[in-house]
């Protein structure tokens, strides 16, 4: 084959015409120290705070300390194969996580990588883990209820969509159970739930995921987990990653419930990183910006204005106390940031009152305006009545001479405590909560012995489901009480049957069947 000089000449001319003088400028530094999830690098002169950097082994890190001679970096991945002298380069980006519908029903780590063995997550959408919270004019007042399905919370310390409500208590007082029950209760409510597990045992998270799957709640839930065995940087960014995933739905007009379980462990991880990065320690060895750590996270939960789509993100941060001390550093910080707190008391929990909500120390600052009318009417003074009952109960230990009014208050208080008890993973629809609280506050339970209260409740629900479903439907659709005469008549009829059944030894259900057959 003959080589033609003209063709070679034309090719050379084409190459010369297409030649562009380009220089790729990359800022590369050298690792001078690595260990315990952090690294120091020299030579990244123009690195920005929070910027993503890439190590030669493919791991990423986030620039945290910008000092004269070097940059302190937290490593988001495998740091055991990084060596002193390795190269590290800037990416010019901040950290982002995958977001979108593809994450629903999945278990992921804080980097958005799947942990459930169900294959890769097919989404091309990402959001930065750190984002500016909505401003004052981008928000609106909390006005819609976020029903937890727990009588003790929906009646005493109601939560609204877009609210931040702290759940605080010692270990093993039922904080996580409240989270799981609240998620289960969102079934059919068009709410996306995000459960962020920080520093928990892998076996515990597995049990929670299986519980959600069993009740069909995983169909609308994203689980973000940074286990106890994970490096501190992953525990630190886990809540921000979960919030970024929630913001994608919130800014598209949807309603989101995000649960941080728990922020105490995140604060401990941040303290560890700060001390390793040689930042000056403050109270309890936490760094000076530990308040900002949580405030910038929780401020991202909001009820957006109608101009922005009217979406919302409700945050339930959890904080663990030591021996019930809510005046410690992290608890007081988070209490001051949130719109109220639900305090779980270990003494109540071990006495069998579950959920162990302490009515005296728990408060919801904005949730009252989100309660439905029916619940406001039946539960208006319930929290104060319960708190005064606790005080009276303490005084009665000193003497037995009680006037009739005090005795009546004590009797009503004992029945209130019993009614607010609830089985695990059995959230109640709001219309049934209203029904039993109406029966309580209008004296229908005063003649029922305390040990029969929960039987009365269950049989009352069965009776109304079978005979007066229209009254329950009225509460559900109108959000208000039905005709009180009809409601009183129905409850009175059931109460008489229940009393007769107790006298004959039948259950109320059996008595009802006998009446139907007759």
Swiss-Prot record:
It is an enzyme of class 7 (translocase). It is a peripheral membrane protein. One of its GO terms (molecular function) is proton-transporting ATP synthase activity, rotational mechanism. The keyword Transmembrane helix does not apply. It catalyses: ATP + H2O + 4 H(+)(in) = ADP + phosphate + 5 H(+)(out). ATP binds at residues 169-176. It comes from the Bacteria. Its EC number is 7.1.2.2. Keywords: ATP synthesis, ATP-binding, Cell membrane, CF(1), Hydrogen ion transport, Ion transport, Membrane, Nucleotide-binding, Translocase, Transport. Coiled coil: none annotated. Belongs to the ATPase alpha/beta chains family. F-type ATPases have 2 components, CF(1) - the catalytic core - and CF(0) - the membrane proton channel. CF(1) has five subunits: alpha(3), beta(3), gamma(1), delta(1), epsilon(1). CF(0) has three main subunits: a(1), b(2) and c(9-12). The alpha and beta chains form an alternating ring which encloses part of the gamma chain. CF(1) is attached to CF(0) by a central stalk formed by the gamma and epsilon chains, while a peripheral stalk is formed by the delta and b chains. Produces ATP from ADP in the presence of a proton gradient across the membrane. The alpha chain is a regulatory subunit. PANTHER family: ATP SYNTHASE SUBUNIT ALPHA, MITOCHONDRIAL. This is ATP synthase subunit alpha. The gene is atpA.
């Amino acid at each position: 084959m003959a080589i033609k000089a003209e063709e070679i000449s034309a090719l050379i001319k084409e190459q010369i015409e297409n030649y562009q003088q380009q220089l790729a400028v990359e800022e590369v530094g050298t690792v001078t120290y690595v260990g315990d999830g952090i690294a120091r690098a020299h030579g990244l002169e123009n690195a920005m705070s929070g910027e993503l950097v890439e190590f030669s082994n493919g791991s990423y890190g986030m620039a945290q300390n910008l000092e004269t001679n070097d940059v302190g970096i937290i490593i988001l991945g495998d740091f055991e194969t990084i060596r002193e002298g390795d190269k590290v380069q800037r990416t010019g980006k901040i950290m982002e996580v995958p977001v979108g519908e593809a994450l629903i029903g999945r278990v992921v780590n804080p980097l958005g990588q799947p942990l459930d063995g169900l294959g890769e997550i097919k989404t091309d959408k990402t959001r930065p883990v750190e984002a500016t919270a909505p401003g004052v004019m981008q928000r609106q007042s909390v006005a819609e209820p976020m029903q937890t399905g727990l009588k003790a919370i929906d009646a005493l310390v109601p939560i609204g969509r877009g609210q931040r409500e702290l759940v605080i208590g010692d270990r093993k007082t039922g904080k996580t159970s409240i989270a799981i029950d609240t998620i289960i209760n969102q079934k059919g409510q068009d709410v996306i739930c995000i459960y962020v597990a920080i520093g928990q045992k892998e076996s515990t998270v597995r049990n929670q995921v299986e519980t959600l799957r069993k009740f069909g709640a995983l169909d609308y839930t994203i689980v973000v987990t940074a286990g106890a065995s994970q490096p501190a940087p992953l525990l630190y960014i886990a809540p921000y990653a979960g919030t970024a995933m929630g913001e994608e739905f919130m800014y598209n007009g949807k309603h989101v419930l995000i649960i941080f379980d728990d922020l105490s462990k995140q604060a401990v991880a941040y303290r560890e990183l700060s001390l390793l990065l040689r930042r000056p320690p403050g109270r309890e060895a936490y760094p000076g910006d530990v308040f900002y750590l949580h405030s910038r996270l929780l401020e991202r939960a909001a009820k957006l204005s109608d101009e922005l789509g009217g979406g919302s993100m409700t945050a339930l941060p959890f904080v663990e106390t030591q021996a019930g001390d809510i005046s410690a550093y992290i608890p007081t910080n988070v209490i001051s940031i949130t719109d109220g707190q639900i305090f779980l008391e270990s003494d109540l929990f071990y006495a069998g009152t579950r959920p162990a909500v302490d009515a005296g120390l728990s408060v919801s600052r904005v949730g009252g305006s989100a309660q439905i009318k029916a619940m406001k009417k039946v539960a208006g003074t319930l929290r104060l009545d319960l708190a005064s009952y606790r005080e009276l109960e303490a005084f009665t230990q000193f003497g037995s001479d009680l006037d009739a009014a005090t005795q009546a208050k004590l009797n009503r208080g004992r029945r209130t405590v019993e009614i607010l008890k609830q089985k695990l993973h059995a959230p109640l629809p709001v219309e049934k909560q209203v029904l039993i609280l109406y029966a309580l506050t209008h004296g229908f339970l005063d003649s029922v012995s305390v040990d029969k209260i929960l039987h009365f409740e269950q049989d009352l629900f069965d009776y109304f489901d079978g005979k007066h479903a229209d009254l329950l439907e009225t509460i559900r659709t109108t959000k208000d009480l039905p005709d009180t005469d009809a409601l009183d008549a129905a409850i009175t009829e059931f109460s008489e049957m229940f009393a007769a059944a107790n006298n004959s030894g039948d259950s109320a259900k059996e008595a009802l069947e006998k009446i139907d057959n007759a």
